[in-house]
Swiss-Prot record:
Tissue and organ distribution: Highly expressed. Predominantly expressed in stems. Expressed in shoot apical meristems, also found in seedlings and meristems.
Organism listed in the record: Arabidopsis thaliana (Mouse-ear cress)
PANTHER family the UniProt entry points to: XYLOGLUCAN ENDOTRANSGLUCOSYLASE/HYDROLASE PROTEIN 8-RELATED
Domain of life where this protein originates: Eukaryota
Modifications the protein undergoes after translation, according to the UniProt entry: Contains at least one intrachain disulfide bond essential for its enzymatic activity. N-glycosylated; essential for its enzymatic activity.
Protein name: Xyloglucan endotransglucosylase/hydrolase protein 24
GH16 domain segment(s): 22-212
InterPro entries: Beta-glucanase/XTH (IPR044791), ConA-like_dom_sf (IPR013320), GH16 (IPR000757), GH16_AS (IPR008263), XET_C (IPR010713), XTH (IPR016455)
Catalysed reactions listed for this entry: breaks a beta-(1->4) bond in the backbone of a xyloglucan and transfers the xyloglucanyl segment on to O-4 of the non-reducing terminal glucose residue of an acceptor, which can be a xyloglucan or an oligosaccharide of xyloglucan
Main location: secreted
């Protein structure tokens, strides 16, 4: 059997569930938290809570080699300083691959920081951070990870905020060989999450709660996402977000990379 056929068969095997939507009972397990993670409304809603003793988290029952995963999330309201709410993909092992949405809480009235990163073979250091153009605690909003062999696209309410392309031809690592599981969690990170750890979690406000709904997992290789690219409209929206709401970009951190930006940052396409 040719390498391509083996690869395609593996993709089909890992993507056995194909497309699933909006049923946490079917698609995920509450992995930790001693009852702080709860599946409600016949599998249509999942809540995670955090108190001084523990946070909580859940994970998909299946691993996926490429896919498009949508999740609606309503973040912790009020004074969420010190808390981190997450939605991400991650493979197993010490040289893991990972694609991150991490929502760093803040004091009442201050915006959340959306922290994104991409790891390949255990190496990350590709952080981009954003503020959002809405209050993510007032209503549910859709956060999506599109991961295909050519690119990773992160979107918020169908607006792209980040694209990470496959530049293996330039020697840049890209996650494409290891199936990943979907994870989500709510946990305390007041040693670093808010203003570098200067603002601590106010436990008098506990328990903190984040809500998830309308999970949709499409891992079917013949779907549109498998070859999806950014059209001109999407590129314009991406530039709008990055111009107005990006607050950190590793590509422009000259102190961190005094010898020059990483290779993927210097490409024009």
């Amino acid at each position: 059997m040719s390498p391509f056929k083996i690869f395609f068969f593996t993709t089909l095997l890992v993507a056995a569930f194909s497309v699933s939507a909006a049923d946490f009972n079917t698609d995920v397990n509450v992995a930790w938290g001693n009852g702080r993670g709860k599946i409600l409304n016949n599998g249509q809603l999942l809540t995670l809570s955090l108190d001084k003793s523990s946070g909580s988290g859940f994970q998909s029952k299946t691993e996926y080699l490429f896919g498009k995963i949508d999740m609606q999330i309503k973040l912790v309201p009020g004074n969420s300083a010190g808390t981190v709410t997450t939605f991400y993909l991650k493979s197993e092992g010490s040289t893991w691959d990972e694609i991150d949405f991490e929502f760093l809480g803040n004091m009442s009235g201050d915006p959340y920081t959306l922290h994104t990163n991409v790891y390949t073979q255990g190496k990350g250091d590709k952080e981009q951070q954003f503020h959002l153009w809405f209050d993510p605690t007032a209503n549910f909003h859709t956060y999506s990870i599109l991961w295909n062999p050519q690119r990773i696209i992160l979107t918020v309410d169908d607006t792209p905020i980040r694209e990470f392309k496959n530049y293996e031809s330039l020697g840049v690592l890209f996650p494409k060989n290891k199936p990943m599981r979907m994870y989500a969690s709510l946990w305390n990170a007041d040693d670093w999450a808010t203003r570098g750890g200067l603002v601590k979690t106010d436990w008098s406000k506990a328990p903190f709660m984040a809500s998830y709904r309308n999970i949709k997992i499409d891992s079917k290789p013949n779907s549109n996402w498998y070859t999806q690219e950014m059209d001109s409209t999407s590129q314009a929206r991406l530039k709008w977000v990055q111009k107005n709401y990006m607050i950190y970009n590793y590509c422009t951190d000259h102190r961190r990379f005094p010898q020059g930006a990483p290779k993927e940052c210097t490409t024009s396409s």
